[in-house]
Amino acid sequence: MAISTFSIGDLGYLRNFLQNECNWFRICKKTFYREYRSVATSSPTFSLNNKPKKFCMHCEIVIFKRSEEFMFSLAVNGIHFGQFLTGKMKFNKKAVPEGLYYYILELGSITPIDLGFIPRYNSDCVTNMRCVTPEVIYENCSIVCPEEANRLTVKGSGDNKLTPLGGCGAWCLKNGGDLYIYTFALAYDLFLTCYDKSTFPSLAKIIFDMIACESEDCVFCKDHNKHVSQAGQIVGCVSNQETCFCYTSCKKKMANINNPELISLLCDQEINKIDIMYPKIKASLSLDINSYAHGYFGDDPYALKCVNWIPVRISAALSRLIVLSCPVCKRVVMD
């Protein structure tokens, strides 16, 4: 791409995308250059000029240092995109557990340049990061105490406003440059003894699996296959990795239960409907799942079992990996 094709607006969108929508994994570190890659979901603001929209954006950066400045070449989806100069470039390391870490890019203003050559991008290189599993999420979350919950707002204005992620009882807090997912998780002993170990048992996931419709054409209840690998191992779109929080069924009010096998995790009584509820007046985060969902048998209401569920806050490093791997969560958080 020629230098002249980049407007000031283009450069601003590109800089924002590289900093705020990409999780970077280091591919190589050499004396004269370094290379990083990111596998990102489609962006609401940044796109490739004159190219069909892609739901996965595989970005590769090769960086060279010159005096007090940095020069970098960028490729997107295997195609050289451009070369740029900046006075500030910093990769901040974020560690989740042992074996899973990534970098967040900090950039100064960027200017198009021409290095006179296009470096070879290591497009086939695969990261060896540990996957995001339910165990990893349990290891990297904290129980939310009543004092913390009272400081968080689920309805109305406030400094600590939670953004709903789509699923029942799942939110994200933007705190400075950090993201924190808040959700209700199945008690760990129940997860170990009676639940699928490949799926993180959030309240959002359990309720979704109970009430999702069976239509193959439903855009809500069927996997949209537009996630990306949270740890960057796979280039291209993947199915929901069962560790996301975007689960939203086509029906939320008095929805019929189509999968009764999970009822015992929510209620001791027999129920055949779930009613998902949303606060109508200003409210802080409630630690009672009955504030967000209720069970019914016909028209008779039944309270859900709070004892099976723990309110948790997922670490900032892990929350960012999860949110940015999902186009739905990323968009609602960035809006």
From Swiss-Prot:
Family: Belongs to the herpesviridae cytoplasmic envelopment protein 2 family.
Subcellular location per the Swiss-Prot or TrEMBL entry: Virion tegument; Host cytoplasm; Host nucleus
Organism this protein belongs to: Human herpesvirus 6A (strain Uganda-1102)
Protein name, UniProt field: Cytoplasmic envelopment protein 2
GO CC, any one term: host cell cytoplasm
Summary of the function given for this chain in its UniProt record: Plays a critical role in cytoplasmic virus egress. Participates in the final step of tegumentation and envelope acquisition within the host cytoplasm by directly interacting with the capsid. Upon virion binding to target cell, a signaling cascade is triggered to disrupt the interaction with the capsid, thereby preparing capsid uncoating.
Top-level taxon of the source organism: Viruses
Any Pfam family the entry gives: Herpes_UL16
Record carries keyword Transferase: no
Gene from which the chain derives: U65
UniProt xrefs under InterPro entries: Herpes_UL16/UL94 (IPR004286)
